[in-house]
Amino acid sequence: RGLVGSEMCIRDRGYMRIYVAGSIFVMMTLGLNMFITTQGFAKISMKTVLIGAICNIILDPLFIFAFHMGVKGAAVATILSQAVSAVWVFSFLNGKQTKLRIRKEYLKVQPQIILPVMGLGLAPFVMNITESLINIAFNASLSKYGGDVAVGAMTILASIMQLQFMPVQGLGQGAQPLISYNYGAAKVYRVKKTIRILIVVSLIYTMAFWLFVECFPGVFVQLFNSSSPELYEMTTWAARIYMGMTGIFGIQMAIQQTFMSLGQAKLSLFIACLRKIILLLPLIYLMPMFIENKVFAVFLAETVSDFISVAVASTLFLCNIKKILAKA
């Protein structure tokens, strides 16, 4: 309540209760859709996402405005949309095309299978949960040193960074089954080729995006702000600092996805923790102690963290990849 305000807390609570009650549909859609992607049905997997998104776009105004449900209506629309996607996924996984069918006799908890799966899933879980902690830390520090304008700038920058990182994350998820399958089949050449393509393409995209942001930050800022000159000025200035090292961050994302694909849960988890928990979280609070411009120091923490984490991830990759592939 103290972080978001009492009025916002009441609205969020109404949304959250409905969303949590129906979250089983969200989990089923996200989890089972990966089994469609793994079999090579990328278009079907994409349709799963589109079905949920299109249904949500249609149902949102209906429940929010037509049925006068407000925020609760948005939650109902989201859950119903995900339920439609879940039905689509189930129908495909019980259809003629799929090789992996849902059968009652397969639904058994086997520790020798589920424990390694949980280990590999721990890294992305940590990444997602620490994202919330980082956002709280950034907002608290920027609110203290720069007020509402600095917090608003941070919100815009986080959205811009998502535009940069989401395609790379999708690329990595697409490469995972290719790397894992060929590694299991001892086709080391194909593994190396896939890893090389993943790293190169990820780096090219993040570098191109970074270069555009550094040269024309105002283009992205205008997408999120059209009314406040002060916010525009703050965000365009902060973008060059906050995203100063995101150009090379595609390397770390590719390396982390590679380690996950090769069954190296500990290395993948360490890289996930390194950037956010070990480096970024302390730097957000420590750097303003040593730099006069406190707002600049908070934004700079992201750049310093990115540089160190990419350097460490690259070193771990170069030192371990040959040993890992030798076990194929």
Q: What does each of the following model-derived ranges do?
A:
Residues F41-A42, G70, G147, S228, ...:
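Short loop-to-helix capping motifs
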Residues S6, L62-M69, S132-S159, L163, ...:
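Helix-terminus/linker motif at the lipid-water interface of multi-pass membrane proteins
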Residues I18, G52, S81-S85, V89, ...:
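Transmembrane helical elements of multi-pass membrane transporters/channels
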Residues V26-S45, A153-P217, F249-S268:
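Small-residue-rich hydrophobic transmembrane alpha-helices
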